[in-house]
Amino acid sequence: MIQASPADSMRACLIALAVLGCCAFIFGEEPLACAASATEAHAASAAPAASSPVIVIGFVGGYVSHNNLSHMEAHLAAQIRAAYPTGVYAAAFENHRRSSAHAAILRVLDTNHDGKLSVEEKEDARIILYGHSWGASEAVTLARELQEENIPVLLTIQVDSVQKYHENDTVIPANVEEAVNFYQPHGWLHGESQIRAADPARTKILGNFRFDYSKQPVNCYAAYPWWDRHIATSHTEIECDPAVWDRVEALIRAKLPPTSSATTATAPEESQ
């Protein structure tokens, strides 16, 4: 067995003292306290970051208020909030408040609250976007904005999507993992019949599902305004049809954690 000479041992001690002395000079601390600070800093940097909640954003159509629970977009967001007091951030927004929804997403993803998103915080994103009519167009447009920031989206859901001016609601951006489209073809106001992926290798289109209310009408809109009930009838029927929204809810819940084991990350209050 090779033993260190007295000279080698002395040299090692001098090097160790020099390192601690430099640390004390730089940080203004006693050597042992400085070493402890360095150890604590390393432990903090090695600690795993908190996981962000699953984010579910719905957009209402037309000029509907985000808190009008007679409309399924708002009602579904409220249901999810009630089922997931923690671990999920669910909110409905007017379709003209996309920037507010975008800001809410960035705020929820910023788990270390430093005002900017790291690569890890972006990669941790689990986002679901849905909407009806103009709201569906906004959902796709918001997904496209998130693509520019390298933020992935789990799922987009369009219900009788009506394209807004300067938007494209038929081509799903490549940052979206899955997308689905529900539409009806009748009336002067009706949705897109087909959506497609900008990059089929990255986005799976779950389907373009057609509903025909001329053959199978539903009477679910008694609480809606006269215009919706008598002029945009089919467009309104698909907005309140339980057969459609049960499928929408099932698609969303399939991406959420089990309610009995929701994570402890608490979403910030909805800002409207």
Question: Residues of each region from the PLM?
Answer:
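Signal peptide processing junction and immediate N-terminal pro/mature segment
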Residues: 25-41
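Long, low-complexity intrinsically disordered segments that are proline/alanine-rich
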Residues: 37-51, 260-272
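C-terminal catalytic-base region of ester-bond hydrolases, centering on the histidine
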Residues: 174-272
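Serine-dependent carboxylesterase/thioesterase catalytic core
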Residues: 76, 80, 87-88, 105-197
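Active-site catalytic motif of lipid deacylating hydrolases and related acyltransferases
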Residues: 48-125, 230
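Solvent-exposed, acidic/flexible segments
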Residues: 65-73, 94, 98-101, 132-139, ...
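Bacterial N-terminal signal peptides
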Residues: 13-26
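Bacterial N-terminal signal peptides that target proteins for export
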Residues: 2-16
